[in-house]
Design a protein with these regions (language model features):
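Conserved class I S-adenosyl-L-methionine
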Residues: 140-167
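Conserved alpha-helix/loop element of class I SAM-dependent methyltransferases that forms part
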Residues: 24, 32-54, 64-65
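A short acidic, Gly/Pro-enriched loop at the edge of an enzyme's catalytic core
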Residues: 108-118
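A short glycine-rich, Lys/Arg-flanked "PGG" loop and its adjoining helix->strand segment in the class I
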Residues: 126-142
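Residues lining the SAM
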Residues: 117, 122, 144
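Class I SAM-dependent methyltransferase SAM/SAH-binding core
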Residues: 54-108
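N-terminal, positively charged/glycine-rich alpha-helical extensions of SAM-dependent methyltransferases
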Residues: 1-26
Length: 167
């Protein structure tokens, strides 16, 4: 396929893509990773999460993953820093009774000391001192992060040989 044809395809796909939060269902079946992860982040959380526990999701995106956990809304809190997602969370999470607050995961969290049993963070920034501060004694922090080598082949296809973004 010629470069112009590819660009035309990408432009058509971009014009119909409706990205809200972290919902990328519009690319379902069009892109797959070469290897599956050797763990299931959702299952790990659900192994620890009990209905009576207070849960905080830092950098929730649009809240899609958080809602998939089906945790009691009155025991659920979330933060997000990206302005379009903040608005989306206000429209979707607040009406459900979820305690949503705008805030950046790497800064001071807008919650009291020792408030949460479980804090989760999927691919977002976080401040370990703040997580320690808001977790109850014996609380659990569960995170899934992206490494410098993730999708390296795709990065090099698009950008050529580049330095790793971090060690």
């Amino acid at each position: 396929m010629k470069e112009k044809e590819l660009i035309d395809i990408w432009k058509r796909e971009e014009s119909v893509a409706h990205i809200h939060g972290w919902d990328f269902s519009h690319i379902e079946g069009k892109y797959t990773e070469e290897t599956d992860l050797p763990w299931n982040y959702q299952n790990i959380i659900l192994d620890y999460l009990k209905p009576e526990m207070k849960l905080l999701d830092i950098d929730t995106g649009g809240g899609e993953f958080l809602l998939s956990l089906r945790h009691p809304y009155v025991k659920t809190s979330a933060t997000e820093a990206y302005p379009p997602n903040i608005q989306l969370c206000k429209e979707t999470l607040l009406p459900l009774g979820i305690d949503f607050r705008a805030g950046d995961g790497k800064d001071m969290l807008p919650f009291d000391d020792y408030e949460f049993d479980i804090v989760i963070n999927r691919h977002g920034d976080f401040n370990t001192k703040e997580i320690h501060r808001v977790l109850k004694c014996g609380g659990i922090f569960i995170t899934e992060q992206v490494g410098a080598e993730n999708d390296r082949e795709l990065v090099e296809l698009l950008l050529g040989k580049t330095e790793l973004p971090f060690p």
